[in-house]
């Protein structure tokens, strides 16, 4: 066992002495040591229940003959960090989480890992760390939050964000915003729609790193405790079989994950996180071109908030991710191995879809192609990303004058000051991985526009958008403005065309004019220190997954 590095032989007497101080006895040194990476925190709703849930994981490990060792890593709530400097730390936190898992696992020679993430950056961060360590690993995602209820309708965090815009437009009162605020998020779990956290949980299950139905089991359901217990037992089987992430995270597994992402209409942030996870695995290549290729042949078959009114609970009841996989048929490589030690095909053999209004059949899709589209053009030569499945048909093609802003704060102020008109194309730049730094999400401006019912407006940014965003919002523009990307050359009044169906984004400027403008402009100075200063120097472009190099 790998843990023999710290527990076997006379030279490891000092190590055993320290382990005895932790409560171990003679019989424990022959058992596998399992690290549990818990991301419990009291300020993130998706993580507040993990302190209790981890105890069921430990019980499963002990029952199967292992020794659990819990350690912790950080978790940032994107909702709470939204629209202020805190959001600059969200994406960079992914790298800290990955490094924490890697450091703890290698520093203590764990034989296996159980990962317990829930929210946006924690899931990919933990997967990246586990891929580096490459010991048997299983993931227990925390589970989605139940939807809130307001006036007989489902409500979630995006309902609250959009209510702020509605109040600004005089459509509802401040008191009504307060009532929505109180009921939209009823308890523990990752926000109830198909936002980034739940999308990444679905990706994790599809990759084969968590047990079937893990992604959609409600956070507060007793079934989630059983899922945690069974995962604890299963990690011992994985250690005995020496089934590692490198055996599971194949090219076919990543293709499957992107396929399910497209079918669900998942968060555009997967175009950052899936490539970043793949970057940690040998002989696997995931690019925006692969997303584009799969998007063109996989239909969008689920309409979950923010694209529609269904919730993750509805998806679970209809068949969960196994039901989506079963529906996709030969678009999925069912030979991929999973943490059950069985193939994906064996896992879903007896699954049935119980509600075809939630998981549509392939012959009756919501859209004929995938929920995410990759756009290219002279604004984004290396690509940009849009959550196509959450764009209404009448907004698939836009052409209008640019209004240019050099920060999220500037555009948000302009929207609330009612300076944005229908037909405008808002350009938000210097918000990329280097330029922000940290590639902030632009949920406040998009939610404000939605709440004000200003519909015929496009948004383009080298930052990113929340998984809760809907509408013609194009993010991840690469190269970013801080890296001399063409988005930095756009000026107020330039005519921009967005054609989502044809994967095209362009400004009516010649290459020569773009080059001249870029040569004569100065990037704004960003006064950053600490971790963000380091991050801005080593982070790569969004089209690489914003990896560090």
UniProtKB/Swiss-Prot annotation:
Q: Which GO terms describe its biological process?
A: isoleucine biosynthetic process; L-valine biosynthetic process
Q: Which residues cross the membrane?
A: none
Q: What positions are modified (N6-carboxylysine)?
A: 121
Q: Kindly state what the record says about how the cofactor is bound.
A: Binds 1 [2Fe-2S] cluster per subunit. This cluster acts as a Lewis acid cofactor.
In this chain, Mg(2+) is annotated as bound at 78, 120-121, 441
Give me the residues that bind [2Fe-2S] cluster, please. 119, 191
Is DNA-binding tagged as a keyword? no
What Pfam family is a match, any one? ILV_EDD_C
Q: Name one GO cellular component term.
A: cytosol
Q: What start-end ranges are recorded for coiled-coil regions in this protein?
A: none
Per its UniProt record, what SUPFAM superfamilies does this chain match? IlvD/EDD N-terminal domain-like, LeuD/IlvD-like
* UniProt EC number: 4.2.1.9
Catalytic reactions on record: (2R)-2,3-dihydroxy-3-methylbutanoate = 3-methyl-2-oxobutanoate + H2O; (2R,3R)-2,3-dihydroxy-3-methylpentanoate = (S)-3-methyl-2-oxopentanoate + H2O
Kindly list the GO molecular function terms attached to this UniProt entry. 2 iron, 2 sulfur cluster binding; dihydroxy-acid dehydratase activity; magnesium ion binding
On subunit structure and binding partners, the annotation says: Homodimer.
> What function does the entry list?
Functions in the biosynthesis of branched-chain amino acids. Catalyzes the dehydration of (2R,3R)-2,3-dihydroxy-3-methylpentanoate (2,3-dihydroxy-3-methylvalerate) into 2-oxo-3-methylpentanoate (2-oxo-3-methylvalerate) and of (2R)-2,3-dihydroxy-3-methylbutanoate (2,3-dihydroxyisovalerate) into 2-oxo-3-methylbutanoate (2-oxoisovalerate), the penultimate precursor to L-isoleucine and L-valine, respectively.
NCBIfam families (UniProt xref): ilvD (TIGR00110), PRK00911.1 (NF002068)
Family affiliation? Belongs to the IlvD/Edd family.
Write the protein's name: Dihydroxy-acid dehydratase
Q: Which species is listed as the source?
A: Methanobrevibacter smithii (strain ATCC 35061 / DSM 861 / OCM 144 / PS)
**Gene that codes for this?**
ilvD
